A protein has these predicted regions:
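Polytopic transmembrane helical bundles with strong interfacial aromatic enrichment
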Residues: 1-139
Length: 139
């Protein structure tokens, strides 16, 4: 619940407000500062979910393992691969000559798009995990 809640809160409340309130560059810097903490929440929650799944036993875990795996894979890919690469591109953009900026911006947009897709995948897998948990408790 915390993991899914943090994704919803950041994606639908924090990020939009920051980008609406601050100029684009400052908003990007602020969100860039938040991202490592955001992904850390995912890592910690992922470990806690793993422990919970191990404690529930295989007979009740079932598809929850799949949902958890998708969530972890998406979080780890975004947090340890996509986000650092995007951060490096943002730094390069600051000092890049005007002739190089369009290429760097296009590469950043590609990484941003991938990050958004990974985030959405983690969110939907998390909702699926919550649904699976609710169905099992209902029985």
């Amino acid at each position: 619940v915390c993991w899914v809640g943090s994704i919803i809160f950041f994606s639908f409340f924090v990020a939009p407000v920051v980008f609406k309130t601050l100029e684009r560059e400052k908003a990007g810097e602020l969100v860039g500062i938040i991202f490592p903490r955001y992904y850390m929440i995912g890592y910690v929650c992922g470990v806690l979910v793993l422990v919970a799944l191990l404690l529930t036993g295989p007979e009740t875990a079932g598809l929850k393992w799949c949902a958890w795996g998708i969530m972890m894979l998406g979080t780890v890919c975004a947090g340890l691969a996509v986000n650092p690469k995007a951060r490096i591109l943002k730094e390069k953009l600051k000092d890049a000559p005007e002739t190089e900026k369009p290429d760097l911006e296009a590469r950043f947009k590609t990484l941003h798009s991938l990050s958004v897709k990974l985030n959405a995948t983690v969110l939907f897998a998390g909702l699926w995990l919550l649904w699976l948990t609710a169905v099992i408790f209902k029985v």
